[in-house]
Swiss-Prot record:
This is Polyribonucleotide nucleotidyltransferase. Its cofactor is Mg(2+). Its EC number is 2.7.7.8. Coiled coil: none annotated.
Length: 689
């Protein structure tokens, strides 16, 4: 592995790339440094291809070592365990960025590892990891001959910013990550605060121009001689025998509108012809016959769309499948909806909780609480397949994150709506675009739950089929169109603009004109879906569900937080137990009181107010005598606040014994006559007469 150390300037920030110093036994490796953030990326691959598979076995792992930020992991074992969701999402970004650049028939098991070794808390490790993956691949002997780069675009005060700092990202109206070669895009992921199509296109154009320079820089790096991947050559006699039967069957299959019926027809034919041909050609593998059959089906399906201008289910290119929307479908949940579009169906629920239900996110740089959560579940029965219910898949994490981005910017501020909100999307049926169904169902369920969201939100998945200079853009693609197409382009948003965007491209040569057309076509589709949703429910319910917790917010002086909590938590524990409520206190003095019963919440609020209110000199209070002493009596005028009634202040007449006037437990009116410098309260009964 040849040593080199070079740097490239990206919008005034230097990326320093070094290779040949560490991890030299890997097929390719490098470190990428920006500021004091350092990422090590390695790539290894088996020398021989896997047999009997029709996909590239690529695994990408992005991990953040806690020592990179000077931290020790929490938990009993004090070491990094399974990847956090954030790490999984970056792994997916890298995978989606580079996968389209591998040869179609490359089948060697390949693993890319990106490890964050140092993080300065300012510079983005994600962009460094994607750049490092490209360099490690490009300088290795793997058949990766076209380098890619990635750039993050933000928008603050109307100005586009290339690779904003982490602090700047929090202020940005746009979080756009774009990967691509010097000529074309390969991956796009974005979350936005209702930006227009024109604004999004402007950001994409800026990203494309920035990528070009980084890709040209990589071409100056020394690279090993590349492995040559040859297209498999099939037995010509076998291929002719298959084509003699399969061409007509494929033409019949691709026009069957129902997914299950089409799959049954084609799978039955495949099983029949495969068994017959394996007897005739015993030296051939079943996977070889499957590959030839799938290629025929692929060509016929694309020919139907590109040349005959007919979609496989008979729809027009911009036609959206039939939509049905229902809300309040589950009786006991806080909010629910059932969104169905064609053969894709999402059951979406909303659960409201108190601030203590917020998710604690322990990231490498910061720890914070997440008020809004969205979880996406994709069981096997959604596609009629058996599937073990194991850990959440990377795909489920990715789809849930996209739907969360789409809905995040319509959520009310925590200042206005203090509840923790959890959305769960259970996919009951799937034939394409289940993540966008989750967005639509999530919006409807939020309305049904009475969450004061800013507007309704919908999403649609777009597809592209391109052959030479000819192409068609499809609205609301099915699973088969996604599989056969050259692009999967998901766009979600409101009537004001885009809130989330995701694009995966399988081909090179995607032009700005195509992207612009796809954005405008997606806008028309989104508006159509919003019309269907608004016809069912156009605004949030005025009231929360009877089963949702009631919440009251109030603010107390910061110096009173200790008094509210009490010694060892005594006061707050008593309030919670007596009123069956939960109380959460922020450092600012903001107090959240939540409970199932409204009366309990109100009672707890009154108690908190009394406990934290200051006694006022000259004010008369109803009090309860708590303790008798020789020199006077102590009385509680407010919860947790006692004052002394000196024996001389018990009555207008001379008092020899305190017990002659008051006894423990008596309720008497008292007046605050003094609060001394130490905060001690002096009371008087005779002054209150």
């Amino acid at each position: 592995m040849e040593y080199f150390k070079k740097e490239v300037d990206v919008a005034g920030k230097k990326f320093i790339v070094e290779s040949g110093k560490v991890a030299k036994q890997a097929g390719g490796s490098c470190t990428v440094r920006i500021g004091e953030t350092v990422v090590l990326v390695t790539v290894v691959s088996l020398k021989e291809p896997k047999v009997g598979i029709d996909f590239m076995p690529l695994t990408v792992d992005y991990r953040e070592r806690t020592y990179a930020a000077g931290k020790i992991p929490g938990g009993f074992f004090k070491r990094e365990t399974r990847p956090r969701d954030g790490e999984v999402l970056v792994s997916r970004l890298i995978d989606r960025s580079i996968r389209p650049l591998f040869p179609e028939y490359y089948r060697n098991d390949t693993q890319i590892s990106a490890v964050v070794l140092s993080h300065d808390g300012e510079n983005d490790s994600e962009m460094a990891a994607i750049l490092g993956a490209s360099i490690a691949l490009y300088t290795s002997d793997l058949p990766f001959t076209t380098p890619i780069a990635s750039v993050r675009i933000g928008k603050i005060n109307g100005q586009l910013i290339i690779n904003p700092l982490i602090a700047e990202q929090k202020l940005s109206d746009l979080d756009l990550v774009v990967s691509g070669t010097e000529e074309a895009l390969t991956m796009v992921e974005a979350g936005a605060r209702e930006l227009s199509e024109a604004e999004m296109l402007e950001a994409l154009n800026l990203a494309g121009k920035t990528l070009k320079g980084i890709c040209l820089f990589q071409k100056t790096l020394p690279a090993k001689t590349k492995i040559v991947v040859e297209q498999p050559q099939h037995n010509s006699l076998l291929k002719a025998d298959i084509e003699a039967e399969a061409v007509s069957k494929a033409e019949m299959s691709v026009v069957i509108k129902e997914k299950c019926e089409r799959e049954f027809f084609w799978d039955s034919f495949k099983k029949d012809i495969s068994s017959r041909l394996l007897e005739k050609y015993p030296e051939e593998l079943p996977s070889t016959i499957d590959a030839i059959l799938e290629d025929i089906f692929y060509q016929k399906a694309r020919d139907l769309v590109l040349n005959k201008k007919i979609r496989t289910d008979g729809r027009g290119f911009e036609e959206i499948r039939p939509i049905t929307c229902e809300t309040g479908v589950l009786p006991r949940v806080h909010g629910s909806s059932l969104f169905t579009r064609g053969q894709t169906q999402a059951l979406v629920t909303v659960t409201l909780g108190s601030p203590c239900d917020m998710q604690v996110i322990d990231e490498l740089i910061v720890e914070y609480k997440e008020r809004f959560m969205l979880h996406y579940n994709f069981p096997g029965f959604a596609t009629g397949e058996p599937k073990r219910d194991r850990a959440v898949s990377r795909r489920e994490i990715g789809h849930g994150n996209l739907a969360k981005k789409a809905l995040k910017h319509i959520m009310p501020d925590g200042e206005d709506f203090g509840y923790a909100v959890r959305i769960v999307s259970d996919i009951l049926e799937s034939n394409g675009s289940s993540s966008m169904a989750s967005v639509c169902g999530g919006s409807l369920a939020l309305f049904n739950a009475g969450v004061p969201v800013k507007s309704s939100c919908a999403g649609v998945s777009m597809g592209l089929m391109k052959e030479g200079g000819s192409y068609v853009i499809l609205t609301d693609i099915t699973g088969m169109e996604d599989h056969l197409g050259d692009m999967d382009f998901k766009v979600a948003g409101t009537r004001k603009g885009i809130t989330a965007l995701q694009m995966d491209i399988k081909i090179l040569g995607l032009t700005t004109e195509i992207v612009a057309q796809a954005l405008e076509q997606a806008k028309r589709g989104r508006f159509f879906i919003l019309d269907q949703m608004d016809a069912v429910v156009s605004a949030p319910k005025n009231d929360l569900s009877n089963y949702a917790p009631r919440m009251i917010t109030l603010t107390i002086p910061q110096n009173k937080i200790g008094e509210l909590i009490g010694p060892g938590g005594k006061n707050i524990r008593k309030i919670q137990e007596d009123n069956n409520v939960k109380i959460d206190i922020e450092e600012t003095g903001r107090v959240f009181i939540s409970g199932v019963e409204s009366d309990g919440v109100k009672s707890a609020k009154e108690y908190v107010e009394c406990l934290t209110v200051e006694a006022e000199v000259g004010k008369i209070y109803k009090s309860r005598v708590t303790k008798i002493m020789a020199f006077g009596a102590f009385a509680e005028i407010l919860p947790g606040k006692e004052g002394l009634i000196h024996i001389s202040q018990l009555s207008n007449r001379h008092t020899k014994r305190v017990e002659d006037v008051v006894k423990e437990g008596d309720e008497v009116k008292v007046k605050v006559i003094e609060i001394d410098k130490q905060g001690r309260i002096n009371l008087s009964i005779k002054a209150a007469l």
